[in-house]
Amino acid sequence: MAAFTGTTDKCKACDKTVYVMDLMTLEGMPYHKSCFRCSHCNGTLVICNYSSMDGVLYCKTHFEQLFKESGNFSKNFQTAGKTEKSNDATKAPNRLSSFFSGTQDKCAACKKTVYPLEKMTMEGESYHKTCFRCAHSGCPLTHSSYAALDGVLYCKVHFSQLFLEKGNYNHVLQAAANHRRSTAEEDKTEPKEDEANPTEEETSDAAAEEHES
């Protein structure tokens, strides 16, 4: 039941309390799903077409216009407070560099590296935007059509079937456990680089033994 209780988190956009069923976390910031909008045009965003800078959300069209096409990041950079000290402007290139650089974060769905432009954080896990899918059916999710339990994502239809209609946590928790187990088994079947490719030392030792024989 704890998953449905209120929180003290405040929405980054409207500054009102965010409850768990309406919560989405992006770039470490809590939002209402309904507040997931471009800060420039106020257009509704979906998971597969948003970009962000320091927690401020944009549609890809305006992100391109403001950051890529203009070539002036400090001028167009919008912060939550809309004001920065002059010496902070010199840090913009560093922010930009870290924004576009690689990370060590792994996608919870495919286990591959997630780069910032394709990264979203939901329920404490990092995902590629294209990997944001229902764990039960694999159908694509949007910010307004997902539900989660124990960090596993579902479309609302299957979450309803597995949890709300049956009124049984065990059923949906079992589905989550099966999902994690299948992911772990897939990881085990992938050969490790050290096992698949012998080192130069191992190759030279084998050649020496063959020569001696």
Swiss-Prot record:
Highest taxon of the lineage: Eukaryota
Classification via Pfam families: LIM (PF00412)
Tissue-by-tissue expression: Exclusively expressed in pollen grains.
Domain notes from UniProt: The C-terminal domain (159-213) is required for the ability to respond to pH and calcium variations.
BP-aspect Gene Ontology terms: actin filament bundle assembly
Species assigned in the record: Arabidopsis thaliana (Mouse-ear cress)
MF (Gene Ontology): actin filament binding; metal ion binding
Encoding gene per record: PLIM2C
InterPro entries: Znf_LIM
Subunit-level organization: Interacts with F-actin.
Basic and acidic residues bias spans: 182-195
One cellular component (GO) term of this entry: cytoskeleton
Location of the protein in the cell: Cytoplasm, Cytoskeleton
Xref: PANTHER family: OS06G0237300 PROTEIN
UniProt keyword annotations, A-Z: Actin-binding, Cytoplasm, Cytoskeleton, LIM domain, Metal-binding, Repeat, Zinc
Region (Disordered): 177-213
Protein name: LIM domain-containing protein PLIM2c
Other comments on record: Cross-links actin with a constant of dissociation of 1.5 uM.
